[in-house]
């Protein structure tokens, strides 16, 4: 199951300083538009590299990522769906 590998990679790449900055940037405080969003602290270019690494991931696993509590896992799922759409035959 690739999903366990994806999650492990993301946890290894997590950066507390970036996560703290992202929480402020995305306004995650009480009553703010991003209230409760949880960040691992991984920049978008790094996530794009993971899209390439996990090109063979199933739609079911991508769907599970979409329901993650972590912002970066959800974003990774969206980036994976975009890649699947681009590589589709129609």
Regions of interest found by a model, annotated:
Residues 1-90:
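Alpha-helical scaffold domains
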